[in-house]
Amino acid sequence: MFRKVLFGRIAGKRRQDMATAGQYAENRAEDSAADHRSGDPAKIFLAEPEVHHPLDADFAIALVLEIAEDLGDAEHANRDGDEIDAFGKFHLSEGEPFLAGIDVLPDRAEKQAHDDHPERLQNRSVRQRNGDKKTEHDQCEIFRCSELQRHRGERRSGNCQQQGRHATGEERAECGRRQRLSGSALAGHLVAIDRRHGRRTLSWQVDQNGRGRAAILGTIIDARQHDQRGDRRKGEGDRQKHGDRRGRPDARKNADQRPQQDADEAPDDVDRSKSCLEAE
């Protein structure tokens, strides 16, 4: 009753003709207010004074609350009270793809594959390079060992040949000092004999190159050669100087000339089989 009196012009609006929130609110409101207002004026009734009732205050409060509720319904003409929460929904939908991208990680898997591929190739190349160096090093060691053995064998054989060919001359030249001391002879080849004035020579036989004189512990043919008296010293010197014309030097000068000449006259074939056995 009071609603019709107070809101007679507003109550005539139909909900399908009311303006929706956010769509041409001004135009639809003017058209609706002019076309659908009530044509009859408000009726006035005569009433008598009434005694105030305690429930009238409660009724008035309820009326005010109802009016406020109706105004709230007018703001939401489509009866969709969740439209205001649409922004929050879009915000949540934008966050979901971001989380999905972190879980999938397609780019990280591809990058890991590219990183592992060159690492395998590098390890392979390193192994091949180390293998080549190892082979060259082993060959170098083998050739070096063979060269050392070859040089050692050549040096040993050269020493054996030198001892076998020129041993007689060198030993005789080294032993032919001015003191003219007799030395030990080689077994079965060279024999040291005692010559005049303590001079010794090396010969193949006991009396070879002896010039007809006696060897050690032999019979003295000419006793005058061993006479060391003062009056015959000059004669022995003359006899020694002129008696042997075969190039033998005097006992008092050029003592090392004859041993060097005899060293050159030594035979070349001095038991080569012995030197070869030592080389092996």
From Swiss-Prot:
This protein's record includes keyword Translocase: no
The keyword Electron transport belongs to this UniProt entry's keyword annotation: no
Residues spanning the membrane: none
Keywords: Plasmid
Superkingdom of source: Bacteria
Basic and acidic residues compositional bias, start-end: 110-122, 167-177, 223-261, 269-280
Region (Disordered): 110-137, 151-177, 219-280
Identification of the protein by name: Uncharacterized 31.6 kDa protein in TAR-I ttuC' 3'region
Source organism per UniProt: Agrobacterium vitis (Rhizobium vitis)
Classification of source organism: Bacteria, Pseudomonadati, Pseudomonadota, Alphaproteobacteria, Hyphomicrobiales
